[in-house]
């Protein structure tokens, strides 16, 4: 009895049997079951052919490529085995026969696709792997990669990028798309980019090492990498994936379309990063190393005062109330106060009411590498939110915090307590319809830029100092030997 292979060869060689193919032993999936087919299984049965020169590379349209949005199939919304068509930019599931990517290639004659996970390019429906140096820029646009040496020199080396339309941009100082009332999201993302310790750590972080996986951290890592990408085709970035992840993780507290307080968002985000990025051995995190300070809190207990060392990542300064009654000459005068007057709160001399209603005195016990200051401008009652427009004047350089350290602290006089401003978030307009923007320092050039969603404008330092600042981030000055915290290898790898 002839084997099946022998019969098949005879049929293939006999022209009379062209219309009589052998019966299939396995039923192929129908078109209606495309979404049920597994790309992984199909690729095992139909492996990609060996590399050949692709004749369709000229059909790729880089202007239509956008990898900032959620990587799901445009038809099934599945996030498994998703490919992007390099001709039209749409996302499709699968690569084997009877998948939507395969069907799209046949119907639209779009033959070049990229895997959104591993950046490999394939030509469909022939299903062969395409390797060409001209595709490297697309892979770097999809998933930017950084070396340790490059990351450590970000704040010292001047680098510029150029979009496909010829527009120049500065990596790290690029606009973020406002997805509907997400300006408060955008300024907090820019704040994290100015903190070199956290930024450098995330740029080099292997997100596969985070167990269990965290979608907030993985999307934040991808977002910051795109912000510093010199190969960005557009010169702007859309934080859509990160905002979606935060919306899910916060159970709708911070989401697209709902305006919120950037201070609350920053607090929530730092706490999450601090929890998820803890070293298993030391129980420390990169967030604690960058923002971790300590306060000596004196609490009134009857006639006595008890003290307790309390950690903090942000300090709050209370702005004095603006005068209610003004004469004709004072109507157009905006009240102004110095930040040093507000910092007297941490000299431990006057008592203040804590959020839980206790009378407390505060002195700084330990200063962080990055000092985050919240200038409390908004007060909320049962009816509305009121904004205090008082201008708080502050130094751009050499903010001396040494006088606020407790005399009992072992850190008194042992550390450099001078800070330089890294960024300042300000609010413009009334509390209901106003918007947030941020002023950031570009360290390689020493220039200041105003970032308001997609708009990036160069500004003078004097303009920054006179804005209605709401959040400030000060960076501790370098020590005498020139060492910087964010270049320390221990701070870059927290998993060893």
What are these regions (language model features)?
Residues 2-496:
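UBL (ubiquitin/ubiquitin-like) substrate-recognition surfaces
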